[in-house]
């Protein structure tokens, strides 16, 4: 057992196993899993609605926890994870500020429908300084923008698995004890806590389904920014 697993940080395990990545089963109707890492998801909805919760929802929840008790929360990239986290944050009584691609009026309207108090383009500044911001879009150029948007002592959380290179920026954006953090995977505790609050928060999961043999079409739609909510593949 590695040091991270002993410390309850199995999300940083030196020898991790991931279904669909290091282990087969990501698109299977049945798979074998270690029961210690399986979550009870009864009563959370139909299979299509639950699917985004098991990826975007879980990493979204961990990034929200890492963002801390931010009253004014910015979300950069209003996709699968963003639209779930926005609802949870609004349910918790936070003020959500949603940032989308420039000109994506549909996504901005969608964010307002889900409880955002403000929605605009990612290159716009929010009307008020943020306590924290979470970046879901894999665009490194958003990091300086998010740092500029948060108050002194605020946090910027990079929640993606990968991100394009972060451009250089003046130290003044990070100064005054702003924090820049990343998120990697999740722990069992994250999953247990998340699925406890899902029924309470009354989440509305927006999905668009694609047959498995149209997976490349789903990726193309995602890249083009033509999807509201989450894409779900059905075998």
Task: Give the label of every model feature segment.
Residues 39, 74, 97, 155-157, ...:
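Structural detector of well-ordered beta-strand residues that form the stable sheet scaffold
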Residues 43-123:
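Mid-domain Rossmann-like dinucleotide-binding core that forms the NAD(H)/NADP(H) cofactor-binding site
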Residues 97, 105-179:
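Glycine-rich cofactor phosphate-binding loops and adjacent beta1-alpha1 units
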Residues 1-76:
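NAD(P)H dinucleotide-binding glycine-rich loop of Rossmann-like/cofactor-binding domains
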Residues 144, 188-235:
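C-terminal hydrophobic helical "lid"/dimerization subdomain
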Residues 159-163, 183-186, 210:
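Short strand-turn motif at the edge of the Rossmann-like AdoMet-binding core
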Residues 77, 100, 137, 160, ...:
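Short beta-strand/turn micro-motifs composed of small residues
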């Amino acid at each position: 057992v590695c040091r991270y697993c002993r410390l309850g940080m199995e999300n940083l395990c030196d020898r991790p196993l991931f279904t669909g990545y290091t282990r087969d089963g990501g698109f299977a109707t049945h798979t074998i899993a270690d029961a210690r890492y399986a979550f009870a998801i009864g009563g959370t909805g139909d299979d299509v609605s639950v699917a985004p919760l098991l990826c975007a929802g879980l990493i979204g929840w961990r990034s929200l926890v890492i963002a801390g008790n931010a009253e004014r929360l910015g979300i950069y990239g209003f996709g699968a994870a963003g639209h779930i986290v926005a609802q949870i944050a609004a349910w918790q009584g936070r003020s959500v500020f949603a940032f989308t691609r420039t000109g994506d009026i549909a996504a901005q309207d969608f964010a307002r429908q889900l409880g955002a108090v403000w929605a605009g383009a990612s290159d716009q500044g929010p009307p008020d300084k943020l306590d924290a911001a979470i970046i879901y879009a894999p665009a490194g150029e958003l990091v300086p923008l998010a740092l500029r948007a948060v108050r002194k002592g605020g946090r910027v959380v990079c929640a993606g698995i990968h991100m394009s290179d972060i451009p250089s920026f003046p130290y003044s954006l990070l100064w005054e004890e702003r924090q820049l953090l990343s998120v990697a995977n999740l722990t069992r505790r994250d999953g247990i806590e998340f699925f406890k609050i899902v029924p309470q928060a009354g989440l509305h999961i927006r999905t668009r389904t694609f047959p498995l043999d149209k997976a490349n079409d789903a990726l193309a739609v995602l890249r083009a920014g033509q999807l509201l909510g989450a894409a779900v593949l059905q075998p």
